[in-house]
A protein has these predicted regions:
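Glycan-recognition surfaces
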Residues: 2-106
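Glycan-recognition and catalytic regions of carbohydrate-active enzymes
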Residues: 101-155
């Protein structure tokens, strides 16, 4: 690990204008030390919104939302082939560093308009979503459906 840290230190010092992102390399393979060099982490290559809700729930116990990248991906999802509404995919991704990894050219005009509105909404609430206090509600694992979250801006 120390060799990796030396490489990260060298990269970030040599190229301070580049935003580097750590990668979990399949999940659960990053540690707090990586955040000393890379300010954000890609938590998992599984971008299916329902799977990702569980992944992000787990990370929320130890990491702030401001460090874990989360993306709205194509539908059907390329890992699970699950078809999930665009709104659901956005709602999950918004509880992280929200991004999109889908071909907008494949979307209908109304979906592209929805993406534009989602990005505007995320920008409006970004301070709360990334830097607010995050409280866990009902667990996503209790068998009663989706978990609940409350976020409030600190200070």
């Amino acid at each position: 690990m120390m060799g990796l840290y030396r490489c990260m230190k060298e990269l970030t010092e040599r190229f301070p204008e580049i935003l580097f992102e750590g990668c979990s390399a399949g999940g659960n393979r990053f540690d707090l030390g990586i955040l000393s060099y890379f300010p954000q982490i890609w938590a998992s290559d599984d971008t299916d919104a329902l799977c990702r809700a569980e992944i992000q729930n787990g990370y929320s116990y130890g990491y702030p939302m401001s460090v874990v990248s989360a993306h709205v991906s194509s539908c059907p999802n390329h890992q699970t082939l699950r078809v999930t509404p665009l709104e659901t995919r956005f709602h999950v991704a918004a509880f992280g560093l929200c991004g999109y990894e889908c071909n907008l050219g494949d979307m209908k005009e109304e979906e592209r308009a929805a993406v534009k509105a989602q990005i505007a909404l995320y920008k409006e609430w970004r301070d709360v979503l990334q830097w607010g206090s995050f409280f866990l509600g009902r667990s996503v694992y209790d068998g009663k459906g989706e978990g609940s979250r409350l976020v409030e801006l600190s200070g």
